[in-house]
């Protein structure tokens, strides 16, 4: 399927679909924990970004990413875009930060998406957030390289210097009760 075909299909579709290298993939529903974590991140970022050109988006706005001989369209769980000229109605092309909340069924895919996302020169931070335990993995652009950092304590603070924000793991996981059974 071509890009224009996908965009027309997706606009009329009742369910969300991602577009990768010409293939269309249906998006599965998410758990309660996934939704709470995504909302916690988006709400806190929205509050911190007031008065700046940056805006936080959640789940239903696509991110267009470059790919070999094509483009991909993903639905990040939370995305922050700061370029006012990046204003397509249904997607953003130049996110500064992308968050993916991991689930057992999507973890490998979300980790793999980073290979595509990192081709976007606007992206400064790619953040993977576990919903099983307090754990955040941050990929941070440093020139031509990417630096990795992991946070595992709820008192830890995630510095999002690219957008002038900070999130503690306590804020990210507010309302989540972790159990050994998960």
Regions found by a protein language model. Give the residues of each.
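Gly/Pro/Ser/Thr-rich low-complexity, intrinsically disordered segments predominantly at protein N-termini
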Residues: 1-182
């Amino acid at each position: 399927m071509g890009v224009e075909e996908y965009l027309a299909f997706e606009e009329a579709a009742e369910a969300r679909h991602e577009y990768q290298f010409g293939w269309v993939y249906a998006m599965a529903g998410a758990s309660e924990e996934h939704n709470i974590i995504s909302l916690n991140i988006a709400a806190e970022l929205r509050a911190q970004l007031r008065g700046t050109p940056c805006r936080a988006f959640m789940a239903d706005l696509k991110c267009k990413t470059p790919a070999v001989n094509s483009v991909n369209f993903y639905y990040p769980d939370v995305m922050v875009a700061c370029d006012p000229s990046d204003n397509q109605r249904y997607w953003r092309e130049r996110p500064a930060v992308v968050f993916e909340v991991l689930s057992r069924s999507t973890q490998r895919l979300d980790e793999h998406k980073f290979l595509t996302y990192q081709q976007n020169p606007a992206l400064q931070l790619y953040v993977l957030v576990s919903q099983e335990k307090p754990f955040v993995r941050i990929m941070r652009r440093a020139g031509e390289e990417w630096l990795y950092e992991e946070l595992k304590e709820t008192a830890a603070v995630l510095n999002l210097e690219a957008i002038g924000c900070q999130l503690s793991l306590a804020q990210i996981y507010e309302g989540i009760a972790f159990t050994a059974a998960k």
